[in-house]
Structures are given as structure tokens and as C-alpha cells.
């Protein structure tokens, strides 16, 4: 008997290496703005220290009778706290306080299954639980796949910026 279950949970210290592998597997993929040093263990530890890193676990029962299970992290998202992003003048003061969702990653084997959207929904719900009025994030202007994925949520494009050597569109949405 095979059974598959996916769930989104807060990441733990034990997940650090697997999350780092998930980030690194994104490098070199089309439109990925990340480099060898970002995101790295520093960002993972920063996010864990603020209880702001969440992962989707794909749990697949190998043998239900024996109770053995193999869990795998297939996606991650962070609630970021980046002063450079927060200082951008495009964010609406009427929607303050707002927070940024970032470092969204989906394992290549699980892409095109709407997992990124599920992670965004979870992230927005978590921000609302924490008392934020809005969510904002940056998307590389050339990342057509991400732009398409985010379009279904009705985010407002509130500006453009160049940070970290990348051209970004600035998105914001009331929660």
C-alpha cells in the first residue's frame, strides 16, 4: 500500500543541510538570480533564528504495514527581514506593517505542480497570523515562470529596483 502526504511546517535545525542542498540545486537554472554564496547557511540560520523558514515535506510511505517512511524537503520559503528591501520607497504606508516573502525554492523534480503557489499561500497566511497587513517581494524581471506564477494572486506591481546586481519588479498585496 502506497500513500503520499505533503505538509508545510516550520523548518528545524535538523533541516539545515537539506535546505542548503535545495537552494544549491537551483543554481544555474534559468532565471535563478542566486549565486554560490547566496542563499547559504548564514541566511538559513538567520531565518531559523527568527522562526521564519518553512518547508514542504513530501512524505512517501514505503511500506504502510512496516510503518517505514521516507521524508524529503521539496520546497522552502522565508519571511525575510532585509533592510535594503524594507527601505525601498515603493511600499504603501497604508499597508504597513508589511513583510517580505523570499527565498522561495521548489525542487526541480516537483516543479510545475503549483507547489510555489501553495508555499506563497502558506507564507501569506503566516504573515497575517503574525499581524502584518501586507506582503511584498521582489521578482527578477526576466523570471517569466515566477511572474506567471504570482499573477494569479493579484499582486500590485508597485515599482522596479536594482538590488544585488539584479533587475527586480516590486510586488505588494494587502493581506
Give each language-model segment a name:
Residues 137-147, 163-167:
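Conserved beta-strand-loop-alpha-helix junction that forms the acyl-donor binding cleft
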Residues 2, 162-175:
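Terminal substrate-recognition subdomain of acyl/acetyltransferases
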Residues 14-18, 39, 144-145, 166:
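Short alpha-helical
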Residues 6-21:
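A short beta-loop-alpha structural element at the N-terminal edge
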Residues 151-160:
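Conserved acetyl-CoA-binding loop of GNAT-fold acetyltransferases
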Residues 106, 112-125, 148-152:
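Conserved acetyl-CoA-binding loop-helix of GNAT-fold acetyltransferases
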Residues 120, 127-138:
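Conserved GNAT acetyl-CoA-binding A-motif
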Residues 13, 24-109, 120-121:
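Acetyl-CoA-dependent GNAT
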